[in-house]
Amino acid sequence: MSRYLIGALLRLTAALPLSWGHALGTFLGGLLWWIPNPLQRIAERNLALCFPEQPRAERNRLLRRNLMETGKGLLELGPLWLWPRERVLQLVQGPVAGEEELAAAVNCKQGVILITPHLGAWELAGLYYSSRYPLTILYRPSRLGLDAITRRGRGRLGGQVVATDAGGLRALLIALRRGEVLGILPDQDISGIGDGERLFVPFFGMAAGTMTLVSRLALKHNAPVFLTW
């Protein structure tokens, strides 16, 4: 049932101008700020851990802005996953900084690792690069049974989407050996799949689990790493 509901919501938001979607996303974020929910609790806890010296009013201001941006990002999925190819790619305006260096690295055929955290326009970045390069994208399967929608959306412009499991790791290795591009969100938890171990390192004064997969692949295969967002 959730799959059909999500599909209907994606089609609805894809039918709207992007500015309308952003306005509705801001409204949705406001609701997430007022109504208790897991996204609110996690963000509130993280802000308290990272900025304990900040007054509660300032942390609440950051929390509200965070949830509004989250709402906008959620309502961008319909346009990104359903709009025609050219309309999606037109969202990337002007030259992309560093793309000449990226293209040169790809042409060396030794494999390239492209990393993007859950920050900024990372969904759009994946679509853009998969339209230009042979890209294998690592993702964590949804707990809501929405894998088919996610795979289709993220792979619609040519990317191969693989899960954070042993099969996905093999697919990454094969793509790297072919000299292709890997797309990895380095803030994912992929512990338990071989090279998916993590190290706990200081982050804003807290020990944060950090994947070692990217550094291991880069060192083992002499693959350059590019950051995008």
Q: Positions of the model-derived regions?
A:
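Catalytic core of membrane glycerolipid acyltransferases/transacylases, capturing the structured
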Residues: 83, 108-166, 171, 192-207
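Membrane-anchoring hydrophobic helices of lipid-metabolizing enzymes
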Residues: 1-116, 146-152, 156-158
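Short, flexible micro-motifs
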Residues: 28, 32, 123, 186, ...
